[in-house]
Every structure is written in C-alpha cells, then in structure tokens.
Amino acid sequence: MTLRDWFLTAQERANPRSELPVWTDGNLAEPLIHGAAYFDRLVSEVESLTAGDHLFFTDWRGDPDERMRPDGPTVAQLFAQAAQRGVIVKGLIWRSHLDTLSYSEEENRDLSEAIRAAGGEVLLDQRVRRGGSHHQKLVVLRRPGEPRRDVAFAGGIDLCHSRRDDAGHAGDPQPIGMSPRYGPTPPWHDVQLAVRGPVVGALDTTFRERWTDPMPLDSENPMAYLRDRLRGSDLRPDPLPEQPADPPPCGPHHVQVLRTYPAVRPRYSFAPDGERTVARGYTKAVRRARRLIYLEDQYLWSTEVAELFAQALHEHPDLHLVAVVPRHPDVDGRLALPPNMVGREQALSLCHRAAPERVHVFDVENHDGTPVYVHAKVCVVDDVWASVGSDNFNRRSWTHDSELSCAVLDDTRDERAPADLAGLGDGARVFARDLRLRLWREHLDRDPGGAQDDDLLDPADAVAAITAAAEELDRWHAGGRAGPRPPGRLRPHRPERLPWRTRLWALPAYRLVYDPDGRPLRARRAGTW
C-alpha cells in the first residue's frame, strides 16, 4: 500500500493557496467516543495550560453554561479561567441564525462575551454563503515550551448542550430542544478525535487561515453589522502569536486534514475557489472499497453522495454498505419534518436499488427503548482508511458549509484474519479496525475488551451478526417486549415514504434550503467536486 492510493495528492487537493500540508506522518490519533469522554479529556488538557500557551477553537454552537463534567466547570468557566492564567485564548464561533429559527444566536454571543471579559478573544464569524454555517468543531492546544504535549481535537462534538452523553445513553442533563420522540434528555451518540504529532500544526494552520482572512466577519449582513456596532462587538481580530514549529513525530498514524469551504464572494484568501477535499477524499476512499464501507452519519442525504456508494456497490459484488443513522430527524412539525425525511429516503432508495442484499441501514436505541440521536460522522473503508469529522454525507457538508475532518491511515497492520479484506495488498490496519469494532461492540452489547470479536472481523460474518442482532431486537419489540431484552441496541432503519402531495413541495425545499450546493457553477455543470 502507498499513501497515494488512499490519500489525496497535492494536485487532487486542488487548493494551492492554502498552507496546509498534503498530509502529515508520525501522529497518534485516538477516538473519543461520546461527549462525556471528550469533555473530560478537554478539561484535563485545558487546566494544564499555563501562561503563554495557546488555546484556539472553532465551533458551530457554544453554550457557556454547558457543564463539561457533572460538577463543572462550564465551557465558559474552563476557557475564561485559562485566559485569566495568561493562556492566549482565541475562538471563532459561527454567527448563528436567529434563535427564533431554532438556532443559537444568543448562546454563541454569550460565550464570546464571557471569554472576552476574562481576557480572551472570541469572534462571531459569518464569512459563509447565504444560508450557510461554519460547522467545524476544533480545539488546538499548543505549549511552545513543551511541543510534545501539544494536542488537538477535531470531530463532530460541539461545546454545547445535549453533547455530554456516554455509552449508557441516558442523555445530557442539559438538553437542547428536539423532536419529542427522543424524550426529555435526548440520548446522543458522537465521536471526536484527539491527535498528537505534526498534524496539530496542520490544524493550527486551519484555525490561523480563518482567523487572518481579511474578509469582514459580518460579510453581506448589514443587520448583523449594525447590531455589532451598537453593542461594541469585536469585529477586528487581533494578531495571533507566532505559530510554533510542528510537534515532533510520536506515533504510527498518517493523518490527512480534509476540509470544505464554499465558493463565496468576497473570496477566502486561503481558498479563492473554495475547497472540497472532504468530498474528494471520501470519493477516493470509497472508490477503493471492495468488501465493507461502514458509516455513522447524522443525515446520509443527497443523491450525489448516494450515487458514489451505488456505483461502488454495482462495480464490486462482494462490497457491503453498513450505515447507522438517527431513527427520526431532530425536528418535528408539518413544515420542518418532510424536507428532512425526503433527502434520506431518496439516497437510501438509490443505494438499495444498486444492491438490495448488500445495503444494511440501522438506527440505535438505549436499553429503555428510547431512540439515540446519531450525530457522529465516521467512515471506515475495508478496515484500512478511517475518518472522523464534522461533515455529514450530504451536499451541504461537501460543498456549502465549512467542515473539517481527519482521515487516518495506520502503519500498524492488524494480523487477525482476514488480514487483507480487499485483497489489494493494503492489509487491515489497527486504527481503522479498532474504531469500527469499538463502535460495533457498543451497538451490539459485546464485551468492550474485544473478547467477543470473532464474528465481527470478516465482513460477511460481521454483516450477518449485526443484521441478526437487529432483527432479533425488532422481533422482541413486535412481540410486546415479552421476556428478557435481547442484547444489542440496533434496529433495522425503515424510512417513511412521504405522500406524493407532500413530496411536491418537500423535495424542492430540501434541495434549495436544507441541502444546497456551494460549488462554483462550472463544477456543478461538470458534476465534479
């Protein structure tokens, strides 16, 4: 296996204006499954920072009062106390749509002001396409005097309400409003990646490119500009400290940072035509798949994305697609619900038509039977290539919003049979296989130490095992829940097909508002990313 077989080359990245490396070697990547694990680790790392260290972060939503541990501190307390110790705290939070539209305008502003009052600088950033968002979830911690301790976190977990859940999936005691089908404290499944080594420098560069971009923070929003002027908001980022050298190599993982930036006017200085390495990176990896693609995704929308999977399934008769998605959208209502449903129904239908016996889609519930909201954005291909990020499998994430993902290739082979799933000589890799197995052990109620992994290694056996467990749990529910609950938390996912009258308006609303296209016109016409 060569890294170029899986990772994008500089030419394939197609963004020469960015200073981001093509990929980095010698890293150590660790998946942190669930918000409780991530928040606990983040508290430990931030509390160890001292004067002159760097704390940079980007976020889609930030709730200042979200408790990082059961007894605190809150997000605002953790970052404000760091600033008070002399840590250089800088943040970019999306300037959200109005709270009246079920977004987080006021929460993001409150977090910004709380950290600013302590000596940090957190800016509300609206340098996106109209109707778009900054969806990256990143924290970079640099210690210029001790670079070996530098660490960064990237993935799907925001610093906000509803995220501090664990494997028990009782939900976060501080919930956000969601569909009532998820209960008063919605169970939440998510993944964040902790990385050390030279990739921390690449993620630092990602933050710095956005921070130093000369485009106005409230671009194309005169109302936001007026409100900011009246409130005395910080609209001009202060200079950042000099970027430290990359941390030294520390592990066997090659990491490629993948991003989405839309084509906008004025242009991003670091991505004049936008950047779509998320879409290109997934496309390259999926086209190399031969036996198993495993996804966890919040949406799994878009016919353009589904066509990629459908083509792979058509070309490779031994390939299986296994996906774990939410049972219900996070919203309810006569107007909001149908556009959320129609995109997934279209995408899954396209995949099923390509290979009806080899597409396996599940949703998750906790042991009380409450559905778990799947917010994770994870992809594992043939137990070789794996990614964790902020991006969903839809056109919005691949073209329209800002997104950030880390793809990982491990030098360390996993010698358990089958040692080479695809037969291409790549060989199963420890990081990718362990990530898939950790997730499946939880979903199937298997031994977390791996003692019950034997039927989860070979793709055909694994698909049979996961399907049998989901069907058995389904039968238990259908039978009135009589007798002991079978092990496992997965149920077969059955998307509801909307009536044709509803589809008439839901489909255009979905394509124009919920899943828009941020590509330049020439890329749209060519059907390329």
Where in the sequence are the language-model features?
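Charged, low-complexity intrinsically disordered terminal segments
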Residues: 1-529
